Amino acid sequence: MICERIAQLVEYAVRHRLITEEDRIWATNRLLDAMGEDEYTVPENVCDCDLEEILSSLCDIAAEKGLLGGDGIVYRDLFDTRLMGLLTPAPHEVISEFEKKYSVSPKEATDWFYDFSRSTDYIRTYRVKKDMKWVYPSEFGDIDITINLSKPEKDPKAIAAAKNAPQSGYPKCALCAENEGYAGNLRSAARENHRIIPITLGGERWYLQYSPYVYYNEHCIALSGEHRPMKINRALFEKMLDFVTIFPHYFIGSNADLPIVGGSILSHDHMQGGRYEFAMERAEIARNISFDGFENVEAGIVEWPLSVIRLRSDDRGAIADLAEKILTEWRGYTDATAFVFAETDGVPHNTITPIARRRGEKFELDLVLRNNITTEEHPLGVYHPHADKHNIKKENIGLIEVMGLAVLPARLKTEMALLKEAILSGADISADERISKHAKWFEAFKDKYVFTEADTEEILKGEIGKTFTAVLCDAGVYKRTEEGEEAMMRFVRHCDGK
């Protein structure tokens, strides 16, 4: 069996152009060594098997031989990534191929690199397919809802082992360029099959890679070559505009640089982009505005639950200048009547989530106004999912959610199945600790529907979509009311706009 599985993996690598025909013997011997084998018999027939099946079988064999170091998905991932790393071309080969493709077109280069990142199993497509996805038709357009099932949860034994493992400062974080080719351990994911492409943004060395979890099509990450904290400033706007100049078919955005309204990684300067049209991009302008001294920049307030100023021009310098002005003014802006405070006790609250894209020859920059103030009533954030929605979404509203794609926790899959069962059986939802958190939520809409076996799941999906849309409204600094719109215009006027 082991010879057959190794032959299948080598065949896969040849077929996906990770190695050539001339590399077969070399690749086979590398895999034999990793599997602790000295002998090999060439199989008569090598069937075309799915990569997940091949790797799973090799991990089973390795476990029997005591090669994994432990039980569970963490150990299996470390081992099968090592196997794929043995078949992944060296960085200089990958960069050379990318540059060759880029000379034809930026799209051809990214098409190739995205396919390559899936072929190496860096993007585990068979896990990504497990994510639950649907569309909710909100008043703001079609909102994408996903329940993230592709990121494996560590089992308790692996968590305990990681806690007891020696601390290491290398790589400094999961985004550092030093992850390329890293073998990994119980604390850090294996990245032997991971490759990055050097790019220049704002005169600095940055790198392009794809997210292994692919929340949307061609979900890429641009990361600084230097491990430094995220910072929203003029230099970042310039880098974003550089990125969409290099890759005009991609958008690029950055999480905010403050806790609560930022992403999960604030310690490493990075952006996220890709080839996908989010609901926010499709959203119309609710109100046209203009700014003195920037007559060549079209501007407007976007019809969106969060507070968004959209800038558009073929003059990228003017867009960067105006974006810097708006950011600077917002950082120091206080409007107590609208409950906007620049700082409290010396702690800053105002920042921006920026997103850049091309519209033909023009550059477009969306500036989402964010504020991370907390109160006794809202200890996790006033402009953060409120407590009555925590059963669906409690985590930060980062860049991806801001644009209209919900990334909801994996627990919801099980909880919604249990909730459906309870609804159809008439059970007391509040009495079941596994789903009691959803009891008040269900009470609010239960009388609107007739629940049947055929319809209940779709009803729950619709209500999840409705709740996530309300979460986005919570995150909006200025609400979609007359008072909210007037308060936002006060800020626009503060920036010499009208």
Give the ranges of each region predicted by the language model.
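Helical scaffold of the NTase/Pol beta-like nucleotidyltransferase catalytic core
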Residues: 193-195, 227-252
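Hydrophobic faces of well-ordered beta-strands that scaffold small-molecule active sites
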Residues: 208, 252, 269-271
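Histidine-centered divalent-metal-coordination microenvironment in nucleic-acid enzymes
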Residues: 217-219, 224, 262-278, 368
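Active-site microenvironments that recognize anionic phosphate/pyrophosphate groups
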Residues: 1-222, 226-229, 305, 319-323, ...
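Beta-rich nucleic-acid/ligand-interaction surfaces
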Residues: 259-267, 345-351
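Catalytic or ion-translocation cores adjacent to nucleophile or general acid/base/metal-coordination motifs
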Residues: 244-264, 273-334
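Structured alpha-helical segments in the cores of large, soluble enzyme domains
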Residues: 206-211, 236-244, 290-297
